[in-house]
């Protein structure tokens, strides 16, 4: 399969499932990974693996959620020194193809109160000169205020792939996002 992609007989349509950072040394979680060991674990000495730990401090800011939020905060002047273009090599949802696509809403997004689902009909057009399958991605941006439940700047809400499109052809796909996906919880 990989040979067919490299030869161009098959057009890839996958997208990155995570962000590819230039270096993990600039990621805030980097300092949390080491050979940390509990120093008061005499009762656990027979379970050597249990005496080691990794400090988890990132909360919701993992992978692309950290980088997208950091870029937004840097643009507002709240994160000095952060440069998205220098930190990220391939963003979340990035995909390579031997063709190009345009995306537009086929109609105004709707909400179905019976299923509590938002529906986004997206028209994807193959604007290149090779057949391929396009992907429509919808990202969610839920605003938050300081002191409220934290939210990442953007989160992938949903996606849908088209059928194979000849050059110039279009397909309309429906991306559904459940209302619960927008919900915030505070357990304090």
Q: What are the roles of these predicted feature ranges?
A:
Residues 118-120, 136, 173-175:
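Hydrophobic residues positioned within well-ordered beta-strands of beta-sheet architectures
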Residues 1-133, 141, 188:
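Secreted, periplasmic, or luminal enzymes acting at the cell surface/secretory milieu
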Residues 129-154:
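Short acidic, flexible loop segments centered on an aromatic residue
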Residues 146-185:
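Intrinsically disordered, low-complexity Pro/Gly/Ser/Thr-rich segments with frequent PxxP/GP/PP motifs
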